[in-house]
């Protein structure tokens, strides 16, 4: 398995077990950020919005020549300081308990997604520079007035404000804070060195408030990050 899976009540993340060494020096890392569903992948089953099973997905072809996977590999091939991160809202997934049907389906889906990338002839490098974060639904066991949650996996007592589930969900930017911390852990040599500079190239997603879109969470997310927003057709159609 190329990635470490971490499941928290309010966040699911897949981080590279062996991040590729990147010579980022003072110029920092170039961050290419994406949504997942209907941006990079879509269900194989026709005329549905959400996958019916963990294997019911495919990379999207916005043109007849290349898939979204091809474009992601091109980014890595052409930019030696690139990292790719996926931020996804998963309102149909509940992580308490971790063995819930929806959580198991989603995590198995991402494991198959990562396996498909690694099995591609150009995917090995991409897999070591790919980070994935998902914001699940607030479970009923965590009421809005829940004041404190202890996360053994983080080695800390998280004095949670009552809106933590909403703050990690797009268009809020809470997932980004976890991504930044994980990057620091992966690439920062010591605490004495300045934090890694992140150059946000763009955020690409399909929820842009158009008539055909189900929401505007992606374009608002980019606005809250002060990052240029791109439609999938702009990135994957060239």
Curated annotation (Swiss-Prot):
Instruction: Give the highest taxon in the source lineage.
Output: Eukaryota
The GO annotation for biological process reads: DNA repair; double-strand break repair
For this protein, the parts annotated as crossing the membrane are none
EC number annotated for this UniProt entry: 3.1.3.32
UniProt key word DNA damage: yes
Going by the record, the broad EC class of this enzyme is hydrolase
Keyword terms = DNA damage, DNA repair, Hydrolase, Nucleus
List localization entries. Nucleus
Reaction(s) catalysed (UniProt annotation): a 3'end (2'-deoxyribonucleotide 3'-phosphate)-DNA + H2O = a 3'-end 2'-deoxyribonucleotide-DNA + phosphate
Pfam families, alphabetized? PNK3P
A single GO cellular-component term on record? nucleus
Q: Give start-end ranges for the coiled-coil region(s).
A: none
Q: Which GO terms describe its molecular function?
A: ATP-dependent polydeoxyribonucleotide 5'-hydroxyl-kinase activity; double-stranded DNA binding; polynucleotide 3'-phosphatase activity
Role of this protein? Dephosphorylate DNA's 3'-phosphate termini. Has a role in the repair of breaks in single-stranded DNA.
NCBIfam families cross-referenced by the UniProt entry: DNA-3'-Pase
What family is this? Belongs to the DNA 3' phosphatase family.
Name recorded for this polypeptide? Polynucleotide 3'-phosphatase
| Gene name as annotated | TPP1
